[in-house]
Amino acid sequence: MSASPDQPADLVLSGGRIATMDPAHSWASALAVRDGRIATVGPDRAVMAHIGPRTRVIHLRGRTVTPGFQDAHVHPVHGGLARLRCELHDTRGREAYLAVIAAYAAAHPAEAWIRGGGWYMDDFPGGTPRREDLDAIAPDRPVFLTNRDGHGAWVNSRALELAGVTAETSDPADGRIERDADGSPTGTLHEGAMDLVGRYAPDDTPADLEAALVLGQAYLHSLGITAWQDAIIRPETEERAYVALASRGELTARVVGAMWWERHRGAEQIEEFVERRRVTSVGRYHATSVKLMMDGVLENFTGAMLEPYLDGHGGTTDNRGLLQIDPEGLSSWLSQLDAVGFQAHFHAIGDGAVRASLDAVAAARHANGPSDTRPHIAHIQVIHPEDVPRFRLLGVAANAQPYWACHEGQMDNLTIPFLGDRWRWQYPFRSLRAAGAVLAMGSDWSVSTPDPLLEMELAVERVADDSRGQKEPLLPEERLDLIDALAAFTTGSAYVNHLDGDTGTLEVGKLADLAVLDRDLFDRGAGAIGETRVVGTFVEGAAVFEDPALEG
């Protein structure tokens, strides 16, 4: 596989294992890059003719090179903000959280609000922390800390007081206030109830948002990620940051923006989306997707299920969760979005939300006929077995977050006991692939790690990286082979991002977006998949991340 070597290459990588991820899953040992595109892929000897006096040559010494990873569902602005604020993602346990929060409050006395997040529900009884713990640390300043999945918030009494949330406050239609027996708020807010307090927090400044995106982009590049789909784009926040960076030439990643569908509005949004797509597509940023939030999460019983949750002791309840968008309206709106070329990016956790999403796509197909909008459903935690083959039949990609597919506290204590036999329908990655679905992958960072290699390890092993050898795999029959997990983070996500014409594989003529790893990824004797590190990330042949070990 080679182009004419009339001009020397700008970059040559040789002596490695090049996972081209082309349709034949071909392997090579070297590649050459010229003018941002791949000029040659093949054996070392085929590349030698492309080396000139100014060619940068990197000797791989057996290390693996892959196409640049693409995250199909991520929140880099939020992830960057989390790293700039009270960051709890790397902390576990009530006492440890309180220590971090107290230290942050002491170090930032001028901040009007203490904001941040990353706490785990299973670190608290019933998954619900209390306001009194925060009151002891910050009685005079409002505290607003989201949990790791962003579907709940821990607040103090001052925040509730400022927002006027009391025992008399009704739950919003799309959320729930945790309460004591007398109706008083405990300090945990779920889903739409978070906005009862969050709306009073200071707006993020453009400078804050741009700094967060710069930080998030650098972090993702350090993990080999060269493209992503941002799963929530709002006009005054994320969109403004992307357009600012892209306009200055500082957006080095390729980004698809999924514009947020306001579930309290209707079809009038579509004309606004069309205009935003036109005026905000700058450089490597393109707003061509629309995010549809179908439900919540299982741990707080807001994930939409076809049948009710159990009560934890095997008894039935009347709670099927929250379907946040009316199915009848959704079918009409999705048909209109599809007709003007928008991709649908669904959040669907429960089997009821997954089915409603598939039904809406079916309605769009009936109304419009085939299209290349490539709808995808993110999270897909519980899928009714009858719906698995519908992904291929309807041309819907399965957008998986594999880091969640394991036994851990939230799974074992807050999910499985309330599902009954349906717990065996969770994260059916292998079944989806066997049924012919396109499988893409993402991290949902800052909900969980954005490291694609750790995510791939979970897809292959279905055991948490910190409990290897201690716990059984979650539904081991749904494990993927490593090559299929890698494909999901490269070719699959490139397909979802409509970037597969130029990226996703390492083939002659395609853009030289690639990741260099610190070892042979497929030599399982070299350590766990998740222990592999990225030492170099390139976009169009230009380094956007380099570890000293790249040349060492």
Locate each region found by the language model:
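Non-cysteine beta-strand/loop elements that form the S-adenosyl-L-methionine
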Residues: V282-T302, V396-C406
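Phosphate/diphosphate-binding loops
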Residues: T252-V290, R374-Q381, P385, M411, ...
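Divalent metal-binding segments
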Residues: A3-G15, A19, P23-E272, L292-A353, ...
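His/Asp/Glu-enriched, well-ordered alpha-helical/loop segment
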Residues: S332-H345, G352-P375, P385, P389, ...
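Active-site neighborhood of phospho(di)ester-bond hydrolases with catalytic His/Asp-centered motifs
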Residues: T66-A72, A378-H379, A440-S443
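Acidic (Asp/Glu)-rich catalytic clusters
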Residues: L245-G249, R276-V282, P370, R392-L393
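Glycine- and charge-enriched low-complexity intrinsically disordered segments
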Residues: E546-G552
